[in-house]
């Protein structure tokens, strides 16, 4: 089963995705997409690793590409948290330059498909974006458009789409109506 879990900031989407993934298989891989770019990020990563270890997840750090996680596939479940970080890391280089969004989209769609085929189950956490209107910086608007397009492409090919609102999972596609 392949499931996309989306929600706004603080909606509970990650906690729901972790519970879902833990229920699907005893072999659990957690793909972390946050870039380690300083002491604060390093501490957050350390804390998250510790929390996930208690749930039986093996963590694979993939801030720029999902392909490294494909090598560990097979039986079991993979949880990617989250697509927003992955898109930002792929779109914006550390020096601030921006990649071609169309190229980034196609690359990430290909990586998601490869990951979904590498594991028995895949759970991806995406960000619900775009409802806030437009942003002052065009680069932020480009990120919003790209994450929205990626969510749509994943939703079209995955078995299940769940939107988490205030901690409540709402099945949009597949699953329980």
Specify the residue positions occupied by each region the protein language model found.
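Helix-adjacent hinge/juxtasegments
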Residues: 55-104
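Short, glycine/serine-rich, charged loops/turns that create anion-binding
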Residues: 10, 35, 84, 129-130, ...
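Generic detector of well-ordered alpha-helical packing
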Residues: 14, 62, 82-83, 128, ...
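Residues at the starts of beta-strands that form the adenosine-phosphate
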Residues: 26-29, 76, 121, 160
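Residue-level signal for inorganic ion chemistry
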Residues: 17, 48, 79, 127, ...
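Structural motif
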Residues: 4, 77-79, 123-125
């Amino acid at each position: 089963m392949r499931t996309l879990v989306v929600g706004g900031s603080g909606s509970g989407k990650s906690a729901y995705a972790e519970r879902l993934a833990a229920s699907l298989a005893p072999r659990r891989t957690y793909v972390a997409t946050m870039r380690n770019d300083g002491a604060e990020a390093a501490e957050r990563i350390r804390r998250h690793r510790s929390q996930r270890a208690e749930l039986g997840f093996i963590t694979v750090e993939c801030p720029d590409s999902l392909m490294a996680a494909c090598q560990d596939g097979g039986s079991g479940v993979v949880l990617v948290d989250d697509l927003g970080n992955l898109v930002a890391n792929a779109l914006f280089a550390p020096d601030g330059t921006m990649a071609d969004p169309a190229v980034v989209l196609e690359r990430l769609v290909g990586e998601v498909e490869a990951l979904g085929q590498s594991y028995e189950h895949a759970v991806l956490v995406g960000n619900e974006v775009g409802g806030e209107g437009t942003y002052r910086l065009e680069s932020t608007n480009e990120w919003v458009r790209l994450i929205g397009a990626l969510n749509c492409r994943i939703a079209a090919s995955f078995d299940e789409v769940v939107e988490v609102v205030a901690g409540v999972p709402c099945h949009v596609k597949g699953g329980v109506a």
